[in-house]
Amino acid sequence: MNRSELVAALADRAEVTRKDADAVLAAFAEVVGDIVSKGDEKVTIPGFLTFERTHRAARTARNPQTGEPIQIPAGYSVKVSAGSKLKEAAKGK
């Protein structure tokens, strides 16, 4: 499902216009991005998803073309965890 299909499904389910559903989805993504980028708190939707920023340590990897070792600097990544209700839905229960 792509963004436009998701917006259409949200609009139908919530009985709002596609424009309004798209605005809500865009605002949700922006708010989650802002909170996660600060890194001081998680965004949790109980039973559904949790978004949090994680620290990745510096590490040595290999260039896949040459096999030469390269240094990858420390940085941050985003961890998304499925909640219990989403896991149950994926199992078909």
Curated annotation (Swiss-Prot):
Protein name as catalogued: DNA-binding protein HU 1
Superkingdom of the organism of origin: Bacteria
Gene giving rise to this polypeptide: hup1
Quaternary state and interactors: Homodimer.
Entry's Gene Ontology molecular function annotations: DNA binding; structural constituent of chromatin
Family: Belongs to the bacterial histone-like protein family.
CDD domains: SPO1_TF1_like (cd14435)
UniProt-listed Pfam families: Bac_DNA_binding
PROSITE patterns membership: HISTONE_LIKE
